[in-house]
From Swiss-Prot:
It comes from the Viruses. It holds the Pfam family CBM_14. This is Capsid-associated protein Vp91. Disulfide bonds join C207-C220, C260-C273. It comes from Orgyia pseudotsugata multicapsid polyhedrosis virus. Residues 1-18 form the signal peptide. Residues 650-671 are annotated as: Disordered. GO terms for molecular function: chitin binding; zinc ion binding. The keyword Repeat applies. Residues 658-671 have a biased composition (Pro residues). Residues 223-281 form the Chitin-binding type-2 domain.
Amino acid sequence: MSDVVLLVLAIILITIFTLIYYTIFFEFDETTFSKRLQVLTEYAKRTNADKPTPDVLGHVSDVYDHTYIVSWFKTDDLSTYHETVHDDTVEVFDFLEQRFAAAAAAVAHRVAPLAAEPDAFVVTGDAGDVKLRCPQHFRFDYDQLKCVPVDPCAGRAPGRYPMDERLLDTLVHNQPSDKDYSAGEHLHHPTLYLRCLADGSHAVRECPDNYTFDAASGECRVNELCEGRPDGFVLAYFPETLRVNEFVECRGGKHVVARCPDQQVFDRALMTCVQTHPCAFNGAGHTYITADIGDAQFFKCLNDREAQLITCINRVRGADGQYACSGDARCADLPDGTGRLMHTHTDDTFEYVSGQTICDNYNVISEIECDTGNVLENKLFVNKFTLGAQFPREVLDAGVCAPATLNNVRVLSDAFPVENLPNDYKVDMQTSVVGLATMMADLTTGADPDTAFGQNVLLAREVDAVGLSPLTAESIDCFGARLFDVMDARRANVCTESGGDLLRTIEFGDGAFLSVFRDDLTGSDADYKQFCAISYESPLKIVNSDHFERRILANILQADICAELYTTIYQKYTTLARKYTTASPKYNYTFVKRPPNIVVYAENTHLKNSTISVPTFDPFAPQPADNKIGPTNALFDPFADRVWRSEPGGDGDHWAPEAPPTQPEAPPAPEPSPLILDKKELFYSCYYELPTFKLTSCHAENDVIIDALQQLRAAVEVDPGCEPAKDLHFVLNAYAYMGNGVGCRSVFDGNNVTVIKEPVPTYTFNNLQTQSDDGVRYNKHVHVKDGRYMACPEHLYDGAAFACNAEPDKLYYLDNMQK
């Protein structure tokens, strides 16, 4: 018994020892031990001459961008002491001094990849950059910040490849290694193979039973079935490509495909050729192929006598031996239904890849469709322009969807159309301004949209052209029956109705301007001297100069509206004092100057407030009659008071009675001052270089005119229905549309200022607030607030109080220059 006990005890001790040994063996990390030994050796080499080896030694063991781990171990047995985590933007570890120090400067990236060397990377240390390299068969993965095995399908086209030793270690055993595989690189697994897919991914596949992978052809080939069998032996082996009249038999120790005699088919149940219809012994639903059909076709029995030809994207055979259709139509155009199908968008301006479909054996295994929504859609530039180009939000770049830029979008044309919103003047500016493809670079980098637009357009005026082709940016003379540029309204072209030939070019000099609604395109205004011309050279400033006003000081002309109105008012408000007849002014145009001044003098002119001197002696003054009843006064009364006068050279002293006091004559009524027509101010409203409205401010130099203006403004008459527009009277000829077919206008009929209701409105507007159809306020001198309408020069309008601070010595008149 003692021997048995000792044997059992020995077995127990051996078992315990074995367990302890394997526990220690498996827990021991040889790689970590080797690294720590190298660290200790390096530290000893560099410091032992100065200081002894410490009991605990630290080193940087892991780096994750700005975060790093310092591992501390005991130097006597290399066992772990502890680990600490640190941020290199805060502190850095000094290996030789074994202490931490404050970071001197921030480092953007501690680890960076090298695009030209996939297996290398750069580590930025405290002393500078250090280039490191991954082991062979590995590459650096920046996302994971570590070396990973090289992709097995990297650099390989889609297809089947033999499974060598390295691929087996990496893909099957999951033990990637950096060892040298060159000795067995010609060896491969007999049945396993690598399938590289079109999307760059891979799969490990295995050939069916009795098949071996042929590395040369990349196909699974059947193993030899005729070994030890006689010639003529028919095999129960029916490959997918075997036709209905074919079978496999042995010849010379190898299997070959044999064919039945004409008009016969092979009965796979009887294993012999028979003369009958293929459906006769298989029935409805049976499928078969013949030599006269395509690779993607097969016959399907409808009954025992008829079959239907089926055409597929891809023909496959199931486990039951029957043919069926498979595959996706999107893969039909790819060789063998395998590959990558790129989705490309092409238009007049840009070309880009919007996505991809990856197929394998006619089946879609991956599909990517990027968000190609137009980033320019519904975008307005300078509040009126839209771009006639589509630029995607994303495109496919390097197999992934990425933000679209000019680096991953191909530019087919440097120019693209620019369209403007509809406007009240029916002006089409697509031939005036053309977009440049460089605009997309600014728009995709977050630049101000209006600035990016203005800096990346080509204007017709820049190349001294009347118009540009919207697609090519080339100079053109015709675009329809007429062509003009509102950004350079010096001229206009008249063409044939088809727009094929130029008939004439109209040049607009002083006194003429572009009138878009006239058939001859020419408007006239004696005061206009191209005041709406834009002097800027920068396209950005030009496209932003859509609405502005020019203020001009000029002389009143002989036949302009100021002379006409002031003459009428002067005639009405000047009369002679006693006869109450209107003083007819007379013009003397010989005194008109250039620049013209008009001074009109009335008959019996007299300046207002002048002083009339009464003569001391009036020999023609009548003597008053004495009508008192009584004795007649004596011709000579010696007792009356007399004044004696002695005249030199006279005969002596004489006396003369005191003359009675003279009754003064009433002074005549003041006569009117002369009508002076001197200065006027012109306010031209401009839509780019197109003059739209002209406000004339006539300066009054006569008190009688100033008084008359006050009286006219105080006694304004208003037609029924125009009460909300009574304040139009501040500016003559001002018009406002109030909706419901009511249009009101301020007029002067020679006697009074009246706001009349037009029988038929001259203009109707969809937007009453802006008095326009497109919502743009072109007329800056008509104001609308709370259903009330007022005409007032813009610089005199008080919007808060809805009041017009009209100048008492000014008369205002408004012209619509385009309609």
